[in-house]
Swiss-Prot record:
<dbReference type="InterPro" id="IPR001754">
    <property type="entry name" value="OMPdeCOase_dom"/>
</dbReference>
<dbReference type="GO" id="GO:0044205">
    <property type="term" value="P:'de novo' UMP biosynthetic process"/>
</dbReference>
<dbReference type="Pfam" id="PF00215">
    <property type="entry name" value="OMPdecase"/>
</dbReference>
<comment type="similarity">
    <text>Belongs to the OMP decarboxylase family.</text>
</comment>
<feature type="binding site">
    <location>
        <begin position="59"/>
        <end position="61"/>
    </location>
    <ligand>
        <name>substrate</name>
    </ligand>
</feature>
<comment type="pathway">
    <text>Pyrimidine metabolism; UMP biosynthesis via de novo pathway; UMP from orotate: step 2/2.</text>
</comment>
<keyword id="KW-0456">Lyase</keyword>
<dbReference type="InterPro" id="IPR014732">
    <property type="entry name" value="OMPdecase"/>
</dbReference>
<dbReference type="GO" id="GO:0005829">
    <property type="term" value="C:cytosol"/>
</dbReference>
<keyword id="KW-0665">Pyrimidine biosynthesis</keyword>
<feature type="binding site">
    <location>
        <position position="37"/>
    </location>
    <ligand>
        <name>substrate</name>
    </ligand>
</feature>
<dbReference type="GO" id="GO:0004590">
    <property type="term" value="F:orotidine-5'-phosphate decarboxylase activity"/>
</dbReference>
<feature type="binding site">
    <location>
        <position position="235"/>
    </location>
    <ligand>
        <name>substrate</name>
    </ligand>
</feature>
<feature type="binding site">
    <location>
        <position position="217"/>
    </location>
    <ligand>
        <name>substrate</name>
    </ligand>
</feature>
<dbReference type="InterPro" id="IPR013785">
    <property type="entry name" value="Aldolase_TIM"/>
</dbReference>
<dbReference type="GO" id="GO:0006207">
    <property type="term" value="P:'de novo' pyrimidine nucleobase biosynthetic process"/>
</dbReference>
<protein>
    <recommendedName>
        <fullName>Orotidine 5'-phosphate decarboxylase</fullName>
        <ecNumber>4.1.1.23</ecNumber>
    </recommendedName>
</protein>
Length: 267
């Protein structure tokens, strides 16, 4: 795992998206990504306004929104991202051949490449998925974009481990600029070959151990000590009975303290 500070890594990173994110993390003292799966745009924007000061990254699933529109959802979302200084990660999990994912990324109702700083993909279809998504981004925007590969998942019974994970890492090596890291539960290495991948870890909780649908939670200290750079937290921030302000600061501090411990810095 990396023991360098976020700012040190930002200064040397090949990806402008990764460098921007790492600098935001250092500036805001946050490695918290909020995962907000809600059905209404108004609820999404309300939660983003409240949680914005505590996060470095917002993870969305815009296809869950029942009232999505570019003008009423994406425009205000981008304004909030600028106001609160966080990036946006649309958790699309692309998993098709290169030409198809290129169209899915750039076209249709959501036009993800136009507004999402980061997206992600499965490695099951091979390296063509990376090339297709990169080409799509270059065709529709001058803004830098980044891709995460899904190397490991937090759900019970996931098939993303072992040989599959190793194969996904090899696919990530096909593009040093566009692929910025992984969705993973552990460090994915690569530093000795010149890669500085960001590791983002879902299934992080300070209280619950899991849910009835197979999600398994690990502690903040556990995942950061194991190599995670960004903790992804969803219902722990805004579920019924939880105050997003209290939980946002609680998880931000827990994640930051764990990072300081890993790199040998004091608060």
């Amino acid at each position: 795992m990396s023991t360098k500070s976020y700012s040190e890594r930002a200064a040397a990173h090949r990806s402008p998206v990764a460098a921007k994110l790492l600098n935001l993390m250092e500036e805001k003292k946050s490695n918290l990504c909020a995962s907000l799966d809600v059905r209404k745009t108004a609820e999404l924007l309300r939660l983003v306004e409240v949680l914005g000061p505590y996060i470095c990254l917002l993870k969305t699933h815009v296809d869950i929104l029942e009232d999505f529109s570019f003008e009423n959802t994406i425009v205000p979302l981008k304004q909030l991202a600028e106001k609160h200084k966080f990036l946006i990660f649309e958790d699309r999990k692309f998993a098709d051949i290169g030409n198809t994912v290129k169209l899915q990324y750039t076209s249709g109702v959501y036009r993800i490449a136009e507004w999402s700083d980061i997206t992600n993909a499965h490695g099951v279809t091979g390296a063509g998925i990376v090339a297709g998504l990169k080409q799509g981004a270059e065709e529709v925007t001058k803004e830098p974009r980044g891709l995460l590969m899904l190397a490991e998942l937090s759900s019970k019974g996931s098939l993303a481990h072992g040989e599959y994970t190793r194969g996904t890492v090899e696919i990530a090596k096909s593009d040093k600029d566009f692929v910025i890291g992984f969705i993973a539960q552990n460090d994915m290495g690569g530093r000795e070959e010149g890669y500085d991948w960001l590791i983002m870890t879902p299934g992080v909780g300070l209280d619950d151990k899991g849910d009835a649908l197979g999600q398994q939670y690990r502690t903040v200290d556990e995942v950061v000590a194991g190599g995670s750079d960004i903790i992804i937290v969803g219902r722990g921030l805004f579920a019924k009975g939880r105050d997003p302000v209290v939980e946002g600061e609680r998880y931000r501090k827990a994640g930051w303290d764990a990072y300081l411990k890993r790199v040998g810095r004091s608060a």
